[in-house]
Design a protein with these regions (language model features):
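Conserved inter-motif catalytic segment of the P-loop NTP-binding fold
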Residues: 71-141
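Hydrophobic/aromatic beta-strand patches that form the interior of the parallel beta-sheet core
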Residues: 39-41, 72-74, 99-101, 171, ...
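The Walker A/P-loop phosphate-binding site
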Residues: 1-91
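Phosphate-binding/switch region of NTP-binding enzymes
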Residues: 161-247
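Short, well-ordered alpha-helix to beta-strand connector turns
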Residues: 36-37, 68, 95-98, 166, ...
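Short, hydrophobic/amphipathic alpha-helical packing segments
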Residues: 52-56, 110-114, 152-157
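Localized chelating/binding microdomains
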Residues: 24, 33-52, 80, 146, ...
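P-loop NTPase motor core
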Residues: 120-192
Length: 247
């Protein structure tokens, strides 16, 4: 008598699932994030709208391209608002499964990431952490240059290791701060620590996405040829956000 073996998906198979932008132009270059990634997205302020949409899409079932997961969202220096979303889900509110934590200083960001992030991820059972404008508190806060460089580097290392250890995806946006004298130094640190780096650029005539760094994907540049709502402004309500304000 023959026995039929029913094979359950292994953890390694589960972790190979790709979490995409759901933007065809980008997917041809970058097939998606996977568990263990610490990714950085460089670009203009509008990039935070894209990050917000990723927070919403992560809640979708896997067969719709989501992670079936809650999300931890860290808003640095009030650079973004999850209420700027006009997006429909089969849920009462697309933000009800997002823990929104806001920080305004380098000290509070350091404390949140190093001391409180693990509890937040475990309590939320989150598979995705999104950090908006991650360098901002260190670029403009009243911290001396050497301390800012040292502590920021520690945070980047911690996030890279945290993503691998807990098998989650961490995506940080790094907005344009060309006027800050620390900007180039912190960008170098960020690029060195992240395993995935994407740069979004916009001119009067073109919109481009460049994959600057990835452990396995081929690097390159792609034009954004279609209209994508994720790169425009959104309107919505913040009633269901879970807010933690860390001054």
């Amino acid at each position: 008598m023959q026995q039929k073996l029913i094979m359950k998906p292994s953890m390694s198979q589960t972790l190979l699932t790709r979490f995409t932008f759901n933007i065809p132009d980008i997917e041809g270059l970058f097939p998606g994030f996977k568990a263990g990634d610490f990714a950085v997205l460089y670009g203009p302020q509008s990039l935070n709208s894209l990050a917000s949409i990723l927070c919403v899409r992560a809640q979708l079932p896997a067969n719709l391209g989501g992670l079936e997961s809650n999300v931890v969202f860290i808003d640095c220096a009030n650079s973004s608002s999850l209420s700027d979303i006009q997006f429909q889900l089969d849920a009462k509110d697309p933000l009800e499964r997002v823990l929104n934590m806001r920080v305004y200083t380098a000290y509070r960001l350091t404390s949140l990431i190093m001391e409180k992030l693990q509890d937040a991820v475990e309590n939320q059972d989150a598979k995705l952490v999104v950090i908006s404008d991650i360098a901002c508190p260190f670029l403009y806060d009243n911290v001396n240059d050497q301390e800012a460089k040292t502590v920021y580097s520690q945070i980047m290392s911690y996030l890279a290791n945290f993503a691998k250890k807990h098998h989650i995806i961490i995506i940080a946006t790094y907005l344009t701060h060309e006027s800050s004298r620390r900007n180039s130094v912190l960008q170098e640190i960020t690029t060195a620590k992240a395993n995935t780096v994407l740069r979004f650029t916009k001119t009067l005539y073109t919109k481009e996405v460049e994959l600057e760094k990835h452990p396995t994907y081929m690097l390159g540049v792609v034009d954004l040829t279609t209209e994508n709502h994720a790169l425009t402004e959104f309107m919505g309500t913040d009633k269901a956000e879970q807010n933690c304000f860390l001054m």
